[in-house]
Amino acid sequence: MPDLDLTLDRARLDALRHGAVVVETRPAVFRVTGSGALTCLQGLLTSDLLAPGDGALLYGAMLTPKGAIVTDAWVFRRGDAVTMVVPCEGRAAALEIFGRTLPPRLARTTDLTGEARVAWLLGDRGFQVLAKSGIGAPEGAGRIHEVGSGDGAVTVALAPETAPFAACLVGPASALEPLVARLVAAGARPGDEQDHHAARILAGWPTLGAEIEERTLPQEVRFDAIGGVSYTKGCYTGQETVARLHFRGHTNRELRGLWWRGDEPEAPNGGSRAVMSGEREVGSVRSRLAVAGRAIGLAVIRREIDPGAEVIAGGRRAMVVALPFRGDELDA
């Protein structure tokens, strides 16, 4: 994982917010097939794999029996087969869960990590660039379709409204490369993982290894707001804790935004993570994005620290803000 204390120049930020940027990554990718693939995965994922029907893209997580996130995942449903895109940090844990819970006669897992690539199309003009490229687009948000066939097929997906990207493409590297070139020819700027994480921070989206830790519960990192959990589907591993929090209680900490408003003489201290309210430590900074002396960040903070509160974060004064960010916090 790259350093999640990011610094971008203004042109790069403007491309992310108002243009189109394409970033090619190499996450863990799994394909689950078999007559019981959908049913088995429905019992593992926090999101509802069945309700959206064939051709759906959804976001969710696999949990421990006590409800903590093991890994998050983007899930692509096509017929009775499911493709899952998982952070590299979650690969080993995902394989362990699949090996322990999926009966081979019903659901078979193929690890495509290293062979498959994912291209993320970021920015407000992402959809326009996809349309101009001639690659083809699904029928609507949260839907997928395939380009090509057989071993060279690439899945193209339009993101749900809250996602930190406009579209994504998943497929073998040899098939994905010419499609990425078409996106660039249509106006997308080639980017890297810093752009990918900057878009995630702007959207208030958590990532494994930063906002999501070993004991993180889905509701602590905005899974309700970003469509990562269903309260109407059947049982799944860890559901009891998730449902109890939703219907009867609340979390003690939540993912919130931080805004260093540029009135301090120095940028936030990259060596400090503590968020202080008076003399009390109330949370920690997990990701930061700085542009021309201004900065925003994601922090996991005690729930009683409301948006609008002034805190000391990274050794500098900051304001707690609701997520996602409005979009103008980094403006000059």
What is each of the regions a protein language model found here?
Residues D14-V21, A199-I226:
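Catalytic strand-loop segment that frames the active site of acyl-thioester-processing enzymes
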